[in-house]
């Protein structure tokens, strides 16, 4: 029973992240709905709904919601990880990065970018509709013409949050309940599912 509880606890970080997304998104959509009803020139329900849909489909709206979620999630999960696991980190992990480590990270990042491109191409070849959906998603959040807020979220805040949630908290808890290789597969699977689309899900799982 205790082991089962530990396994179930592995899902808590991902579930909390999903809950935070809804907690941020629902009020934002509510404010957008109010904005639609108070839009100048909207004289009917249809006009108000059109204005509302225009608001929530803009890149700025989606970027703002993403940034708000990312900021809240970063604070929550960084505090959780610090309080629960900071003292268990090896001493060499706590030391500042040196030049060879930074250089190695940069080389790895470039290599992973190439691998990601191949994975995306392979996945899209299996089902072109997956790539079409992903392309529409990228366009809807403004990644084709990113703003400063979206760049900060996509390059810094979002990746750090995801690392804390999955390769941080989820993996740490999973290793308490199962062998490392199963724990690693579980966090990778949850990481992929969390993206809610096949293209990102596949390369998130593999990489």
Model-derived regions, located:
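N-terminal, membrane-interfacial amphipathic/helix-forming hydrophobic leader that caps
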Residues: 1-103, 110
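Short, intrinsically disordered low-complexity segments
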Residues: 2-5, 116, 166
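Aromatic-anchored segments of alpha-helical transmembrane domains
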Residues: 17-22, 110-114, 188-197
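Membrane-interface elements of multi-pass transporters and channels
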Residues: 23-43, 83-88, 122-130, 168, ...
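Flexible domain-boundary/linker segments
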Residues: 40-45, 136, 187, 191, ...
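Juxtamembrane helix-loop-helix connectors linking adjacent transmembrane helices
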Residues: 55, 87-164, 172, 176
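Transmembrane helix-loop-helix hairpins at the membrane interface
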Residues: 147-207
């Amino acid at each position: 029973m205790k082991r089962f509880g530990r396994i179930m606890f592995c899902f808590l970080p991902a579930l909390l992240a999903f809950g935070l997304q809804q907690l941020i998104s629902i009020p934002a959509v509510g404010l957008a709905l109010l904005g639609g009803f108070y839009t100048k020139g909207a004289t009917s329900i249809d006009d108000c709904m059109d204005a509302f849909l225009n608001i929530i489909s803009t890149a700025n709206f989606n970027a703002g919601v993403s940034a708000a979620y990312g900021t809240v999630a970063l604070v929550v999960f960084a505090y959780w990880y610090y309080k629960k696991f900071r003292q268990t980190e090896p001493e060499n992990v706590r030391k500042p990065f040196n030049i060879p480590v930074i250089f190695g990270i940069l080389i790895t990042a470039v290599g992973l970018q190439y691998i990601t491109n191949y994975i995306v191409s392979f996945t899209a070849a299996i089902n072109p509709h997956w790539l079409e959906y992903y392309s529409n998603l990228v366009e809807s959040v403004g990644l084709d013409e990113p703003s400063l807020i979206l760049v900060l979220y996509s390059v810094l805040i979002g990746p750090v949050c995801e690392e804390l949630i999955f390769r941080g908290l989820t993996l740490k808890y999973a290793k308490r309940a199962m062998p490392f290789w199963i724990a690693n597969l579980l966090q990778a699977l949850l990481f992929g599912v969390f993206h809610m689309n096949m293209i990102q899900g596949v390369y998130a799982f593999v990489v």
